[in-house]
């Protein structure tokens, strides 16, 4: 495998100043510039725009991704659960085709194959999923009274912002998250509107092409954006989350949440920010749901051309259940959150939490980015547990004090060329004295990732 990566580096090396970069959401890419052979810097660039007619609106774009990720975690759940230390590696291969049949019709299909190797614990649905339909949707573009409207039908991903706090594609694990349903995107009077109604896709991994929609986990909503994602914007949204047979506090029942949120992000001079607040109401069985969360990242980029240092402050909080056994559930559900929001380790989830972190990133050279920082985590209320991903109560954590622990994190990313990126993360997490008294261990997590995009 190392020889394959090395060969790819040589084959795909070369300047590509005029070619568009690859995106986390591959269906957002626009490679029409590569219709000109003069802009094709690598052998695979010719696949990005295959003309299907005499005009530029009819073409096929082919692409894919190969990702290798090795990781080691020595104390899952701080050593308080049944699982022990483990180290293993992921292999993910995705291939897609993007057919544009004129200005009004587009079809995007992606096949994904995800494997896990060397894991001692049983593989989960986010670890492995043999060849299956990752994405398959059709876009229909029309204009109504001069305003553009896009209708998207089929299997698709949802992500509305860069941080992806509560709705994310789940890039960190091996199997990305998808939904089956319908989405409408329109613009009118300087506002962008998005409406959707979806069933989550159930990843099965029993055999190839066995994934199905899961009507027991439904997600719908409406978002309204004022401004541009490239500068400053303000979003208001409503989500409806409905899950049959959801687990909470040792019980299982129907869970329905209506989430109302505001999010603002942008840049002003050397300052940047991303701030979000969400309030949830609903029912879990016979209990009423009242929960909340806030997430904030504030950054400052220092002047000067050398190393491009950026200092960021992260302030987050999410409610926990203050009175177990009553008729109200106050534990915040982070819905379809980005698992790597705090770190890639999955040690903590965005529930019953107060997090404060400070991080510094630098770029010693143009392709190399380094980041280092740390923070402190505590439970928002002592009556509720600390939670690991995905919304798993950490055993015996309700016995300890509010303080969960202190962590230090180091990240490195090296962009070899337009196609290949190497990255790593190291985490050192020291549990609080209260958690250590009930048996918690210090946690060390490490990962290395090679990602090849074309």
Could you tell me what each predicted segment is?
Residues 417-449, 453:
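Predominantly the C-terminal beta-signal and adjacent terminal strand-loop region
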Residues 6-13:
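Bacterial N-terminal signal peptides
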Residues 14-86, 125, 302, 307, ...:
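N-terminal periplasmic/intermembrane-space "pro-region" immediately following the signal or transit peptide
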Residues 64, 93-99, 135-140, 182-186, ...:
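Residues on the lipid-exposed face of transmembrane beta-strands in outer-membrane beta-barrel proteins
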Residues 144-151, 165-325, 398, 404-408, ...:
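Signature for the C-terminal beta-barrel architecture of outer-membrane proteins
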Residues 21-41, 250, 287-398:
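Extracellular/periplasmic loop regions
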Residues 72-91, 99-147, 160, 164-169, ...:
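Surface-exposed loop and membrane-interface regions of Gram-negative outer-membrane beta-barrel proteins
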Residues 68-74, 111-117, 155-159, 188-190, ...:
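Transmembrane beta-strands of outer-membrane beta-barrel pores
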């Amino acid at each position: 495998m190392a020889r394959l990566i090395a060969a790819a580096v040589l084959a795909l090396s070369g300047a590509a100043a005029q070619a568009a970069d690859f995106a986390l959401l591959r269906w957002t890419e626009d490679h029409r510039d590569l219709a000109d052979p003069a802009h094709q810097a690598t052998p695979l660039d010719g696949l990005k725009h295959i003309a299907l007619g005499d005009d530029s609106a009819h073409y096929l774009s082919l692409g894919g991704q190969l990702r290798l990720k090795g990781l080691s975690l020595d104390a899952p759940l701080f050593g308080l659960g049944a699982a022990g230390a483990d180290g293993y590696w992921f292999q993910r291969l995705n291939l897609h085709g993007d057919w544009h049949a004129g200005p009004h019709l587009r079809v995007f299909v992606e096949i994904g194959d995800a494997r896990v190797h060397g894991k001692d614990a049983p593989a989960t649905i986010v670890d492995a999923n043999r060849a299956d339909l990752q994405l398959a949707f059709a876009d229909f573009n029309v204009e109504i009274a001069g305003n553009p409207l896009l209708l998207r039908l089929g299997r698709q991903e949802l992500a509305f912002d860069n941080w992806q706090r509560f709705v994310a594609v789940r890039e960190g694990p091996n199997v990305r998250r998808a939904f089956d349903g319908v989405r409408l995107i329109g613009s009118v009077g300087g506002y962008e509107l998005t409406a959707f109604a979806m069933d989550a896709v159930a990843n099965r991994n029993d055999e190839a092409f066995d994934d199905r929609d899961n009507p027991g986990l439904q997600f719908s909503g409406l978002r309204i954006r004022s401004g541009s994602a490239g500068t400053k914007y303000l979003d208001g949204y409503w989500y409806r989350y409905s899950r049959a047979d959801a687990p909470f506090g040792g019980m299982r029942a129907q869970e329905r949440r209506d989430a109302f949120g505001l999010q603002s992000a942008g840049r002003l001079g050397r300052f940047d920010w991303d701030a979000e607040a969400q309030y949830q109401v609903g029912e879990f069985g016979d209990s009423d749901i009242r929960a909340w969360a806030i997430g904030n990242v504030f950054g400052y980029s220092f002047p000067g051309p050398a190393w491009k240092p950026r200092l960021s402050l992260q302030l987050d909080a999410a409610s926990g259940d203050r009175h177990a056994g009553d008729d109200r559930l106050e534990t915040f559900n982070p819905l379809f959150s980005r698992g790597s929001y705090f770190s890639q380790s999955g040690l903590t989830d965005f529930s019953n939490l107060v997090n404060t972190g400070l991080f510094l990133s630098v770029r010693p050279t143009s392709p190399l980015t380094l980041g280092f920082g740390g923070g402190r985590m505590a439970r928002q209320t002592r009556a509720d547990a600390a939670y690991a991903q995905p919304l798993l109560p950490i055993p015996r954590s309700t016995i300890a004090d509010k303080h969960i622990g202190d962590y230090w994190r180091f990240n490195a990313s090296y962009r070899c060329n337009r196609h290949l990126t190497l990255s790593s993360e190291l985490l050192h997490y020291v549990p609080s004295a209260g958690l250590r008294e009930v048996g918690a261990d210090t946690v060390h997590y490490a990962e290395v990732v090679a990602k090849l995009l074309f």
